[in-house]
Amino acid sequence: MSPSIVFTGGGTAGHVTPNIALIKEFRKEGWNVEYIGSVSGIEKEMIEPMDIPFHGVSSGKLRRYFSLKNLLDPFKIVLGIIQSSLLFYKIKPDVVFSKGGFVAFPVVVGAWLNRIPVVAHESDMSPGLANRLSFPFVNKICLTFDAGKKYFKRQDKIEVTGTQISSQLLTGNPMKGLEVCRFISSKTCLLVMGGSLGAGSINSCIRSALKQLTSEFQVIHLCGKGKLDSSLVGVEGYCQFEYANEELADLFAASSVVISRAGANSLYEILALGKPHILIPISSQVSRGDQIQNARYFQGLGISVVIQDELLKADVLLQAVQDVMRKKDEIDNKIKALKIESATDKIVAIIKEQAHVQTPRIV
């Protein structure tokens, strides 16, 4: 009988894309794979095309700010735990892997109630709320950065691994990327990414600076679902996508500089691909500040050029692009010195090891 694994994680693509890299590895080795996510999250549309059984459960948002919706969240979380527990009783997987996000906590607790071992993964410098709450119920947690260890009491549960990256992303073809965009090879390409949901401030800034940017560069713009600007279709040197899946590796390969939010997964991919970059972290007014922390760390190493979201304007962005181009060789060398690589093999080994470990009855 083939071993089985359940994956969970969702809310944004950053909690799903790393799972996809692992799913491909486990399917290649003959494991049965299923996924538990939120009922209406982005994870469903990302996972279902892979022909994997998807189960939606109730989940609370785990907000850190006051909202009347917070009054309902505990009930949603309890319902999610019950639904997950019943699913696990039926599926009986050997192990569960959690990538975090608000759906993960009820799934992790449901697995613990069924004595199913859980391996979690945290991408950021400091753990998100879902992983903080899940920590007592997991067997192991894999961290991207060593700096994250200080936030957890049980050091024996921690493995610093890095982040899993799809092997496909590392083998992009620059000529194919240029061909998709109908670009020429003699002009430098910039790749702009605002995350799976898009980034309004980045989109607006790129479009306001487009005339100046395209006079010197070619711009590949991943602007988010529903965020395309029809008035810019056909502008020479500019190619916009809602998001990129199969072609993302080629678009990365075609680009010399990346402009991006500072989510840990995207940042890790950018570093693994050795791309000089500009980071525009989400403001702490609308987030827990994890992207700011990620960006500051690599800015301190002289690797990342960082623009505060509140200060993002066309002239500031144009100056940052010029700064990166001027220091490109220096930045290239500093990124190479980090020796960032995909952690897929390490994490797969930990998951397999924990599949045979008894889950403790007391947290």
UniProtKB/Swiss-Prot annotation:
UDP-N-acetyl-alpha-D-glucosamine binds at T12, A13, G14, S196, Q291. Keywords: Cell cycle, Cell division, Cell inner membrane, Cell membrane, Cell shape, Cell wall biogenesis/degradation, Glycosyltransferase, Membrane, Peptidoglycan synthesis, Transferase. This is UDP-N-acetylglucosamine--N-acetylmuramyl-(pentapeptide) pyrophosphoryl-undecaprenol N-acetylglucosamine transferase. It catalyses: di-trans,octa-cis-undecaprenyl diphospho-N-acetyl-alpha-D-muramoyl-L-alanyl-D-glutamyl-meso-2,6-diaminopimeloyl-D-alanyl-D-alanine + UDP-N-acetyl-alpha-D-glucosamine = di-trans,octa-cis-undecaprenyl diphospho-[N-acetyl-alpha-D-glucosaminyl-(1->4)]-N-acetyl-alpha-D-muramoyl-L-alanyl-D-glutamyl-meso-2,6-diaminopimeloyl-D-alanyl-D-alanine + UDP + H(+). PANTHER family: UDP-N-ACETYLGLUCOSAMINE--N-ACETYLMURAMYL-(PENTAPEPTIDE) PYROPHOSPHORYL-UNDECAPRENOL N-ACETYLGLUCOSAMINE TRANSFERASE, UDP-N-ACETYLGLUCOSAMINE--N-ACETYLMURAMYL-(PENTAPEPTIDE) PYROPHOSPHORYL-UNDECAPRENOL N-ACETYLGLUCOSAMINE TRANSFERASE 1. Belongs to the glycosyltransferase 28 family. MurG subfamily. InterPro entries: GlcNAc_MurG, Glyco_trans_28_C, GlycoTrans_28_N. The lineage of its organism: Bacteria, Pseudomonadati, Pseudomonadota, Gammaproteobacteria, Legionellales. GO terms for molecular function: UDP-N-acetyl-D-glucosamine:N-acetylmuramoyl-L-alanyl-D-glutamyl-meso-2,6-diaminopimelyl-D-alanyl-D-alanine-diphosphoundecaprenol 4-beta-N-acetylglucosaminlytransferase activity; undecaprenyldiphospho-muramoylpentapeptide beta-N-acetylglucosaminyltransferase activity.
